Amino acid sequence: MARLSGVDLPREKRVEIALTYIFGIGRTRSRETLAATGVNPDTRVRDLSEDEIVRLREWIDANYRVEGDLNREIKQDIRRKMEIGCYQGLRHRRNLPVHGQRTHTNARTRKGPRRAIAGKKKAGKK
């Protein structure tokens, strides 16, 4: 089993797809990596030579931030926005959608389950 950036790649999948199991690498970056290292995208992970695995590992480490480094950078960016008090930071701080989505209805994923609010009481006759 090939191990790149701390992730075990599935042996039966094509390399082009298997690389997308690494956080920070999607289909496009996977294709770029394979083209730059000269590895055939249709090769199965189990058929990769040790030399190809080393080339892939070195290319990814040199050119992309992936896995833990990328996660850390994303968290730092969010924390920085919260500290400087920009609009996006305020939305993060209040656990509301950040990218301009409506919140009157919907946004349940971000806001969490509904909290029950006491309904209107009917006024009694005078």
UniProtKB/Swiss-Prot annotation:
<dbReference type="InterPro" id="IPR018269">
    <property type="entry name" value="Ribosomal_uS13_CS"/>
</dbReference>
<comment type="function">
    <text>Located at the top of the head of the 30S subunit, it contacts several helices of the 16S rRNA. In the 70S ribosome it contacts the 23S rRNA (bridge B1a) and protein L5 of the 50S subunit (bridge B1b), connecting the 2 subunits; these bridges are implicated in subunit movement. Contacts the tRNAs in the A and P-sites.</text>
</comment>
<dbReference type="Pfam" id="PF00416">
    <property type="entry name" value="Ribosomal_S13"/>
</dbReference>
<dbReference type="InterPro" id="IPR001892">
    <property type="entry name" value="Ribosomal_uS13"/>
</dbReference>
<dbReference type="GO" id="GO:0003735">
    <property type="term" value="F:structural constituent of ribosome"/>
</dbReference>
<feature type="region of interest" description="Disordered">
    <location>
        <begin position="96"/>
        <end position="126"/>
    </location>
</feature>
<dbReference type="InterPro" id="IPR027437">
    <property type="entry name" value="Rbsml_uS13_C"/>
</dbReference>
<comment type="similarity">
    <text>Belongs to the universal ribosomal protein uS13 family.</text>
</comment>
<dbReference type="GO" id="GO:0000049">
    <property type="term" value="F:tRNA binding"/>
</dbReference>
<dbReference type="InterPro" id="IPR019980">
    <property type="entry name" value="Ribosomal_uS13_bac-type"/>
</dbReference>
<protein>
    <recommendedName>
        <fullName>Small ribosomal subunit protein uS13</fullName>
    </recommendedName>
</protein>
<comment type="subunit">
    <text>Part of the 30S ribosomal subunit. Forms a loose heterodimer with protein S19. Forms two bridges to the 50S subunit in the 70S ribosome.</text>
</comment>
<dbReference type="InterPro" id="IPR010979">
    <property type="entry name" value="Ribosomal_uS13-like_H2TH"/>
</dbReference>
<keyword id="KW-0820">tRNA-binding</keyword>
<keyword id="KW-0689">Ribosomal protein</keyword>
<dbReference type="GO" id="GO:0019843">
    <property type="term" value="F:rRNA binding"/>
</dbReference>
<keyword id="KW-0687">Ribonucleoprotein</keyword>
<keyword id="KW-0694">RNA-binding</keyword>
<dbReference type="GO" id="GO:0015935">
    <property type="term" value="C:small ribosomal subunit"/>
</dbReference>
<dbReference type="GO" id="GO:0006412">
    <property type="term" value="P:translation"/>
</dbReference>
<keyword id="KW-0699">rRNA-binding</keyword>
<dbReference type="GO" id="GO:0005829">
    <property type="term" value="C:cytosol"/>
</dbReference>
